[in-house]
Design a protein with these regions (language model features):
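Small/polar-rich, solvent-exposed N-terminal microdomains that initiate assembly or binding
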Residues: 1-44, 62, 66-73
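Short beta-strand elements
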Residues: 19-23, 81-88
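A common structural junction motif
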Residues: 72-80
Length: 120
């Protein structure tokens, strides 16, 4: 099983200074990016499939969209494929609080510890 938590965290820190493994309880400082590994399963002897969920929280719709676009650029640049995203009309979750969740998937070559680009 491949553990890519630290690599994903370092990648997301290039987008936002406030990155956590999961959303903390109580009041939080925004913007905030949270990430969690949703699945990490072997495909066969040579490959694992990893799935991530990235949650982006911000004060305004424009800010959440800008952060989502930056996350998308970084994750797809690493070779992950976006498999789902929160629709725009469901992103306003409270007074001055916007949330978009983005799901990513990738096939990982275990021998070389690399992402197989374009795989889902």
């Amino acid at each position: 099983m491949i553990d890519a938590r630290e690599q994903v965290k370092e990648l997301l820190l290039t987008v936002c200074d406030n990155v956590k493994m999961s959303k903390p309880d109580g009041d939080v400082e925004l913007p905030l990016i949270c990430y969690t590994e949703r699945s990490n399963l072997p495909v066969n002897i040579a490959y694992d499939r990893i799935q991530w969920r990235v949650a982006v929280y911000a004060n305004t719709f424009e800010e959440v969209i800008n952060l989502v676009n930056a996350v998308e650029e970084k994750m797809t640049g690493l070779g992950f494929t976006r498999t789902a995203v929160t629709p725009d009309d469901e992103s306003h979750i409270g007074t001055d609080l916007y949330l978009k969740r983005i799901d990513y998937s990738a096939l990982i070559n275990k021998e070389y510890n690399t992402v197989v680009k374009g795989s889902v």
